[in-house]
């Protein structure tokens, strides 16, 4: 029997999505794994959760069972200190940081686990940080010859000092409509379509409420497609392209992703998508991703253009990633991810 320490919740805006992903995993994980659920509250407290509520998008509550991480590297054991002072130890083989957004998939928790020499599922510090920061994703991938949209970066600390200058440079460089988004947020938080110049300052302010910097780029009239990747017995396996039919918004926002009905079209039926698996694999390896990821593209007349990379995609029942592999059940997708990570631990 193998033991999996499942980290979920976290301090980001995607706390409830992580909770839902963890709940789905707990319901479908195979019997070969004993799961140790450790939630992170919105304030950053690590707590041992003997159960996870059946609420789809719940919240990790401080139940008094605080988790103490090992004080020396290589020790795969946590101490659970209960409210009345009693404590007990729990051993594990592998950590699954099923966390979304900042302080979860941006390299921070990965750095802590690396420092403690604790094996974990998913990409390491560099790949996680580079994929989370859309500015550096574009820099790295464009240097590797992967098509990306042109962009303009606005750092939060400079915006209020040079607002008029930024607005002029953006209007000189681009034509409307534009798309404004935080540089380091997920689940489409802080994103806005901008049709006119007058809407631009508000959109930038909105993005900066959700991230340290904002990115402005052309708003393409082009479908977005998704490619999920998973390492299977040492071989990177790409799913077919997925297109998501949704209604009620101009883009695949939080409501469409998690609240409203959607339809997955697999495979996506668009021209100019030849070679998508090679491009997605190149992105995966250029950033040094591990175990699993999702790559998002726009389909243009000249071919695929990279949008974003997600090193910790949602694993809810409604999420794109587990739905992408039509020949695999949800439990098989999870087992493949875990087997890939566990094999690397045993080497």
UniProtKB/Swiss-Prot annotation:
Keywords from the UniProt entry: ATP-binding, Cell shape, Cell wall biogenesis/degradation, Cytoplasm, Ligase, Magnesium, Manganese, Metal-binding, Nucleotide-binding, Peptidoglycan synthesis
Cofactor note: Binds 2 magnesium or manganese ions per subunit.
Top-tier EC class: ligase
Nucleotidyltransferase listed as a keyword: no
Main location as per UniProt: cytoplasm
GO molecular function terms listed in the Swiss-Prot or TrEMBL record: ATP binding; D-alanine-D-alanine ligase activity; metal ion binding
Cofactor: Mg(2+); Mn(2+)
Cellular component, GO annotation: cytosol
Binding site residues for ATP: 171-226
Classification via SUPFAM superfamilies: Glutathione synthetase ATP-binding domain-like (SSF56059), PreATP-grasp domain (SSF52440)
Residues at which Mg(2+) 2 binds: 308, 310
InterPro entries: ATP-grasp, ATP_grasp_subdomain_1, D-Ala_lig_Van_CS, D_ala_D_ala, Dala_Dala_lig_C, Dala_Dala_lig_N, PreATP-grasp_dom_sf
Domain ATP-grasp: 138-339
Gene3D superfamilies: 3.40.50.20, ATP-grasp fold, A domain (3.30.1490.20), ATP-grasp fold, B domain (3.30.470.20)
Catalytic activity entry: 2 D-alanine + ATP = D-alanyl-D-alanine + ADP + phosphate + H(+)
GTP-binding found in the keyword field: no
Subcellular location: Cytoplasm
Biological-process GO terms, alphabetical: cell wall organization; peptidoglycan biosynthetic process; regulation of cell shape
Enzyme Commission (EC) number: 6.3.2.4
Family under the similarity heading: Belongs to the D-alanine--D-alanine ligase family.
Function: Cell wall formation.
UniProt name for this protein: D-alanine--D-alanine ligase
Naturally occurring in which organism (per UniProt): Tropheryma whipplei (strain TW08/27)
Source lineage: Bacteria, Bacillati, Actinomycetota, Actinomycetes, Micrococcales
């Amino acid at each position: 029997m193998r033991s999996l320490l499942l980290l979920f919740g976290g301090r980001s805006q995607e706390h409830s999505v992580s909770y839902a992903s963890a709940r789905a995993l707990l319901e479908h994980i195979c019997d070969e794994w004993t799961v140790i659920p450790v939630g992170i509250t919105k304030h950053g407290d690590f707590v041992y959760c003997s159960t996870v509520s059946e609420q789809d998008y719940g919240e990790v509550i401080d139940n008094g069972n605080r988790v103490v991480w090992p004080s020396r590297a290589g020790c795969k054991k946590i101490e659970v200190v209960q409210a009345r002072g009693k404590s007990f130890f729990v051993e594990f083989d592998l950590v699954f940081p099923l966390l979304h957004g900042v302080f979860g998939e941006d390299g921070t928790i990965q750095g802590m686990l690396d420092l403690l020499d604790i094996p974990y599922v998913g990409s390491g510090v560099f790949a996680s940080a580079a994929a989370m920061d859309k500015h550096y994703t574009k820099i790295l991938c464009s240097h590797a010859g992967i098509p990306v949209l042109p962009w303009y970066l606005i750092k939060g600390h400079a915006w209020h000092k040079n607002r008029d200058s930024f607005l002029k440079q953006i209007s000189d460089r681009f034509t409307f409509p534009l798309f404004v988004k935080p540089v380091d947020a997920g689940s489409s938080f802080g994103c806005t379509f901008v049709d006119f110049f007058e809407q631009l300052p508000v959109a930038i302010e909105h993005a900066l409420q959700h991230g340290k910097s904002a990115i402005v780029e052309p708003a393409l009239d082009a479908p977005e497609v998704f490619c999920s990747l998973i390492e299977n017995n040492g071989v990177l396996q790409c799913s077919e392209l997925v297109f998501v039919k949704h209604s009620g918004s101009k883009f695949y926002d939080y409501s469409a992703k998690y609240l409203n009905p959607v339809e997955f079209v697999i495979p996506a039926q668009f021209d100019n998508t030849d070679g998508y698996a090679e491009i997605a694999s190149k992105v995966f390896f250029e950033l040094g991703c591990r175990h699993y990821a999702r790559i998002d593209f726009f389909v243009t007349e000249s071919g695929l253009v990279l949008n974003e990379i997600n090193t910790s995609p949602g694993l809810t029942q409604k999420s794109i990633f587990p739905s992408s592999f039509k020949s695999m059940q949800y439990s098989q997708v999870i087992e493949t991810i875990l087997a890939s990570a566990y094999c690397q631990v045993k080497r």
